[in-house]
Amino acid sequence: MAARWADYITPSTLQLAPLLELLLEPVGAAPRLSELQLGLQEALVNAVRHGNGCDPAKCLRVRRIVTPRWLVWQIQDEGPGVPPQARVRHLPQEPAAHTGRGLFLIHHCFDDVRWSPRGNRLQLAARRPRQPAGLIWLSAGLGPSDGDSLDR
């Protein structure tokens, strides 16, 4: 299976349910669906609120990439970017704080989290669950001759 991708451009609003549904389409009923949905929603809300300042004239650009082993989402806003020192992955020290949990949740929900140098593009990756090779071949027409390894 070669990598497949889809690009989405959407106005910077908090009406994210339709976009989330499209982004999660390849996940299906995987055990991690709720976890990935939570992480993606948090990343999208952060991009709208903090990156684009809830300005509907600005857009979010999202790319979904599906490979045999990974599901990857790249979320880019039009903001100035998150500085490296603010890309923390721990909970706020003040338990009553109203903000500061988003990046912690994002890091918890995904297997790999990376930032662009500018800090306005976030890449989130989740390992795909291993499936018996025979089922993959029957459902997708793949086999060893297609370059897909048996040792996923």
Locate each region found by the language model.
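Short beta-strand element(s) in the Bergerat
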Residues: 69-73, 120
